[in-house]
Amino acid sequence: MALTKHRRTLEAAAVVANLAFTFLYVNDSLWSYAFGILGPALLLALCIRERFYAEPLLQVVYILMTVYGWIHAQSSPWIASALWHVIAIPVCILVAVGAAYFLRRTAARYPLQDCLVTVFGIFATWLMMNQDPAWAWYFLFINALCVWMYYRRSLYLGTAMYVLYFAMALDQVAHLSIFSA
């Protein structure tokens, strides 16, 4: 599949903005929030163009969560209890499967995977913006799935971005401090 110049430019800009957000966020920079709005806005346009129909919702949520995080950046962290995760995981799976059932009737590419990324991404982003370190565990799963989806669509810059996101989430989980100061 030949890539158009517009598609490559949009993908590259989205990747740069999203990586800037993540790198700045894990390093506690308030500048991260500007990129946390720009990056998802660009990915939203790319996802619509590539017929990922659930993920644009995730990009809108990312923008809203970034605004929420910006407003609450100086607040104390909120840490979810283990019970939250025991409840949230099956609920996220059920919501994703239900949404995928309806998306199967559209031209959506990979509806179940798209919905899993979207639903778990919303929950993980909420954890992230509340400074709960459990966000990184969810993003290991989400980013691995995104690597597969983006690679299958020949979105190689996006694939590389999600590989790097996976590494950043692993860095957070393992406390390696490779990407953070």
Model-derived segments and spans:
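Alpha-helical membrane segments and adjacent membrane-interface helices in multi-pass membrane proteins
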Residues: 37-73
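Juxtamembrane boundary at the C-terminal end of a transmembrane helix
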Residues: 170-181
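Hydrophobic, membrane-inserted alpha-helices
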Residues: 14-21, 38-44, 118-125, 140-147
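Intrinsic, low-complexity N-terminal interaction/targeting segments
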Residues: 7, 107-128, 132, 136
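Cytoplasmic-side transmembrane-helix entry/capping segments in multi-pass membrane proteins
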Residues: 55-63, 82-87, 109-119
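N-terminal membrane topogenic signal
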Residues: 1-13
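Short, hydrophobic transmembrane alpha-helix segments
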Residues: 23-31, 46-50
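Hydrophobic core of alpha-helical transmembrane segments in multi-pass integral membrane proteins
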Residues: 20, 85-103
